[in-house]
Each structure stands twice: as structure tokens, then as C-alpha cells.
Amino acid sequence: SSDLQGAYALVVSSPRKMIGARDPFGLKPLCIGKRDNTYFLASESCAIAAVGGEFVRDVEPGEIVSFTKHGMKSDKTMAIDPNKQARCIFEYIYFARMDSVIDDVNVYHARIVAGKALAESYPVDADLVVGVPDSGLVAAKGYSEQSGIPYGMAFHKNSYVGRTFIKPKQSQRESSVKIKLNEIGRAHV
């Protein structure tokens, strides 16, 4: 419906039917996977691979897909002009896992390219390029490759601390980062 606004990828499921929808601008990803005769929906292609499934395709911006025992149906009545579509850059540089593919773009490759572009636009005189785990590591590798500055590790991420930038207060974000990241000490190449 045109009443549904904003950025979304949603899935509704019952014992007999599963429905997936993606916002008309394509801001949030949603993809279709299949294993044997079972379809499933996921926000990232890596989730499909993790359960032994085969990536079928991305749900297109503005598309609603439905699955029953009779197969898949597609409704594109909410689709808009592709020139008006947009992607959320945060999906490629932060949210998505590096082993995902979103709208035919390999996330790992996108981060390498972003790091190389950053090195071209903002060269620096430095001894070492380091990234902030996890999403910044690959971009740092791209920066290193383009600039010729060695790449190394300087931080360890506490895997048990969730996303820090979404905390409601700056003081909470700052204290969460202190718990989340530890210096390795002397950075090594």
C-alpha cells in the first residue's frame, strides 16, 4: 500500500504463507533463498549460505513476494522509477556482513573500493593504516593497497558488546565504545 512509508524490509509468516516486502526506494535489503523445496527470506545473502541454502535473487525495491505450497508470486505495483530509487550506504559500509551481496554488489569489494577512494581523495603521511573492527577493517585494507602504507591491527573488539552508535545518549555511546574496543598495544604489520 502507498500508506506504508519509510525504509523497510519486512517478512510476515503463517503456517500456510510467507510474505516479504521491500520499500520502493530499496533502502533496506531483502533476498530470497531456497533449499530443497523450501523458500526463505533474509536481510542478507550470508544468512542463506549459513543454513545451506542457495541464493535465488534480491527482492526488488517496491516488490512484494509471497510463498505458498504452490510456489512464489511477485507483485511490483509499489515499484517506482529506478532513477528515484536509493540505497542506504550504511548497509555497505557498516550494517552488512562482508560476505554478503546486496543488489549484486559484493560488500567486501564495496569496502575495498571505498578505502581506495578515500586514499585517493585524502592522502596522508602515515606509518600504518588501521581499521576499527569489524566493518572498518576491509576499508582500511583498501586504503593501504591504494596508498602503499602498510596495514596493521591496533584494536581488538569485544564480541559481546552490540552496536554502539545507536545508543540514545552521547555519554552512553562513549562508555560503550570504551568497553567494546581495546588497544592491542604496539600495532603490528
Model feature map: region roles:
Residues 188-189:
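A short, hydrophobic C-terminal helix/tail in secreted or cell-surface proteins
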Residues 2-136, 144-184:
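N-terminal segments that mediate ammonia production and transfer
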